[in-house]
């Protein structure tokens, strides 16, 4: 067992309370902590769902950055966003999600945090805008950007003011037809700019809307920003001097369903000129051969430079993300930074005009690194955070950083760190605040490395409540999606390993071939190897666990996975490894090889299987879970979950698998949500999902009998449709 890196679990048993599905789903969910200009306090939002009232309540709080104390700012559920206004330590601009004058619109209000309820309305906006970024100019005026849906003519889309069409028909002459969970229309996301004029009056200055909003995206045909379904405020930035806006858009001049290519556009804040790409095919500074996705544009403090990341490959969504720094107005080739570093960045911010901070996935964590703005390609950035996954970071006046993160053991962790000293002080953490998470701590998690098919593979181990290594617990083998993704030391409300562990399992979550954060070689090796290298890594991982962990019962083990993990569960069902498990759970996995062409992002399958469906069909069929010889091996009880709004992997994939399992006489159940996509996010649906998944696993692993508090399939009140005689 020398490869296992024990934390404190070897010496002491955990005293954590069991985390159950209701507690997970109803525990408070908090946003990033956003500091004021002086770094004295920070604001953050909090929402909480109640299974008693079946409603969500929300509030905004103030965190004292010296004491860590938290106090309520407002529990007005209409307050959707708050940003600090200028250099004033107590004045904020907030978004009121309702509009007294325009149904479906929002309002901008200005208030002092010491007297929040007595603010005033500064602007009335004609649609549902969000993602506000603001700067105060030398004149004292406030310039801002935000986004909303847009009509082709550039006006903001307001759903409440649109007449319902007489026909529901949709007509398409190009792809996409649909994406993620929606059908494309002639509408698109767009970044708008606006100004609040400062007026000096009695007491404090006041602000009022000045002029109309400007659509900065619509003048570029086929451009869209933020880019759905996951784009947001990180897709654009406003220069500190208020003069420029940079935004990301997928390439507007090539088919978007076939390529990942994206450009960073630059446009005056007032929209006086049409946006132009700084890294497009005709841009003078575009690096040679760099044609892939791009994102996270951010201006330097002096507004003279833009940092962003970009991939080289135009068909590989998980290609290496390299950092670039563009000088505004320059026609020189845009230089890359630390391009030889075997890590791919997720986010970037400026520390000052000469240095940057980047967020990077690294060995199952997401850490912060510092890097000079003129670093060469051979530079190795320096890490200054440790475990967990960083979700946000803001520079404080003393050049330290206010960091918001999560971990497997906490949903919210706020601390101060610096490039020179590392983590300095923890201010607040959810497992000390929330009764639902009471007692959770880093001791519930370990990791180990083992020899995989061709290299060492990392795996997390998550222990159950009151773990005792002298006892034996069934294995729950956790397989992640992506496939170019990974299990991270992060909190999840959908696939939380601690919830599974506390039923009475030891969860083992490997990061096999294809996993991100362990170098490009491991990640890229999955291409055309979906059922090859990763499966072999998982087999070797199971063997390692079986041989080395006396407290893990592999005879009664179970396995579960989603998306690519769902594919792998389907593949395992027809493989020898499938006979090692008492039950399987497949969530939104591909099943029929020839159905892969029904997805929306065609570049994905074309990259993964080295070509198009018609030129390389054998590559698609090479790893086909529905191959006849594999179906004949199906025998392990299996729960299949697939929802109607999943357009990435259509619901027919799950139905096909369920049909075959039923006809083969394999114990099986199909769980469907007509209103969910690739994920299950509705709180009540999430509870049913957990009850069914955990109940299925508990039934066949024996946990249902050994743990009187374990979730049972009978916990679900939804009736089961069963027409068997």
From Swiss-Prot:
One of its GO terms (cellular component) is extracellular region. Glycans are attached at residues 75, 96, 153, 258, 383, 453, 610. One of its GO terms (biological process) is proteolysis. It is an enzyme of class 3 (hydrolase). Keywords: Glycoprotein, Hydrolase, Protease, Secreted, Serine protease, Signal. Pfam families: PD40, Peptidase_S9. The keyword Hydrolase applies. Residues 1-18 form the signal peptide. GO terms for molecular function: serine-type endopeptidase activity. Gene3D superfamilies: alpha/beta hydrolase, TolB, C-terminal domain. Its EC number is 3.4.14.-. The active site is at 563 (charge relay system), 646 (charge relay system), 678 (charge relay system). It is found in: Secreted. Belongs to the peptidase S9C family. This is Dipeptidyl-peptidase 5. It comes from Aspergillus oryzae (strain ATCC 42149 / RIB 40). The lineage of its organism: Eukaryota, Fungi, Dikarya, Ascomycota, Pezizomycotina.
């Amino acid at each position: 067992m020398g490869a296992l890196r024990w934390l404190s679990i070897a010496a002491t048993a955990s005293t954590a309370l069991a985390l159950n599905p209701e507690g997970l789903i109803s525990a408070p969910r908090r946003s990033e902590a956003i500091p004021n200009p002086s770094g004295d306090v920070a604001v953050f939002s909090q929402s909480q769902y109640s299974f008693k009232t079946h409603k969500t309540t929300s509030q905004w709080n103030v965190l004292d950055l010296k004491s860590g104390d938290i106090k309520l700012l407002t529990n007005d559920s209409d307050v959707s966003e708050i940003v600090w206004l200028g250099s004033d330590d107590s004045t904020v601009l907030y978004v009121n999600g309702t509009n007294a004058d325009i149904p479906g619109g929002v309002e901008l209000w200005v208030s002092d945090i010491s007297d929040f309820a007595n603010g005033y309305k500064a602007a009335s906006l004609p649609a549902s805008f969000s993602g506000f970024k603001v700067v105060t100019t030398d004149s004292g005026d406030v310039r801002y950007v935000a986004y909303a849906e847009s009509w082709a003519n550039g006006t903001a889309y307001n759903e409440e003011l649109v007449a319902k069409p007489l026909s529901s028909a949709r007509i398409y002459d190009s792809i996409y037809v649909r994406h993620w969970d929606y059908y494309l229309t002639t509408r698109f996301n767009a970044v708008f700019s606006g100004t609040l004029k400062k007026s000096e009056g009695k007491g404090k200055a006041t602000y009022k809307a000045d002029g109309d909003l400007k659509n900065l995206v619509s003048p570029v045909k086929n451009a869209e920003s933020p880019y759905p379904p996951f784009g947001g405020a990180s897709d654009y930035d406003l220069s500190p001097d208020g003069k420029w806006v940079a935004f990301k858009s997928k390439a507007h001049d090539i088919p978007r369903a076939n390529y990942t290519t994206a450009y960073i556009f630059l446009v005056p804040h007032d929209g006086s000129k049409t946006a132009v790409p700084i890294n497009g095919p005709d841009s003078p500074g575009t690096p040679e051969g760099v044609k892939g996705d791009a994102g996270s544009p951010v201006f330097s403090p002096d507004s003279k430079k833009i940092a962003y990341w970009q991939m080289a490959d135009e068909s590989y969504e998980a290609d290496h993300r390299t950092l670039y720094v563009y000088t505004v107005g320059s026609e020189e080739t845009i230089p890359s930074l630390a391009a030889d570093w075997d890590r791919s960045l997720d986010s970037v911010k400026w520390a000052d005009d000469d240095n940057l901070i980047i967020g990077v996935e690294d060995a199952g964590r997401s850490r912060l690194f510092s890097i000079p703005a003129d670093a060469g390609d051979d530079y190795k950035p320096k890490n200054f955070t440790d475990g967990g996954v960083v979700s946000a970071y803001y520079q404080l006046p003393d050049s330290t950083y206010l960091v918001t993160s999560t971990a497997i053991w906490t949903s919210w962790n706020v601390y101060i760190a610096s490039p020179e000293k590392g983590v300095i002080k923890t201010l607040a953490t959810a497992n000390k605040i929330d009764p639902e998470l009471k007692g959770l701590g880093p001791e519930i998690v370990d990791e180990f490395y083992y020899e995989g098919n061709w290299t060492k593979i990392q795996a997390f181990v998550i222990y159950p409540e009151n773990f005792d290594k002298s006892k034996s617990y069934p294995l729950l083998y956790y397989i992640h999606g992506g496939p170019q993704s990974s299990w991270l030391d992060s909190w999840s409300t959908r696939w939380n390993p601690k919830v599974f562990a506390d039923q009475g399992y030891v969860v083992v979550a490997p990061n096999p071939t294809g996993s991100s954060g362990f170098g490009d070689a491991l990640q890229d090796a999955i291409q055309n190897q979906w059922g090859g290298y990763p499966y072999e890594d998982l087999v070797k991982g199971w063997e390692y666990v079986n041989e080395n962990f006396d407290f893990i019962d592999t005879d009664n083990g179970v396995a579960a996975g989603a998306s690519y993990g769902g594919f792998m569960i389907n593949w395992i069902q027809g493989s020898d490894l499938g006979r090692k498990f008492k039950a399987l759970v497949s969530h939104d996995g591909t099943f029929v090889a020839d159905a892969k062409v029904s997805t929306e992002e065609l570049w994905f399958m074309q990259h993964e299987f080295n070509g198009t469906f018609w030129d390389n069909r054998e590559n698609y069929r090479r790893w086909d879970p529905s191959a006849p010889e594999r179906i004949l091996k199906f025998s392990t009880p299996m729960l299949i979950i697939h929802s109607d709004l999943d357009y990435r992997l259509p619901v027919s994939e799950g139905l096909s698998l369920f049909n075959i399992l039923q006809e083969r006489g394999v114990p099986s159940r199909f769980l469907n949500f007509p209103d969910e996509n690739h994920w299950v996010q509705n709180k009540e649906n999430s509870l049913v999902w957990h009850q069914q998944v955990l109940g299925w696993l508990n039934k066949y692993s024996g946990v249902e009998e050994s743990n009187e508090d374990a979730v049972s399939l009978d916990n679900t009140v939804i009736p089961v449709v069963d027409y068997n005689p």
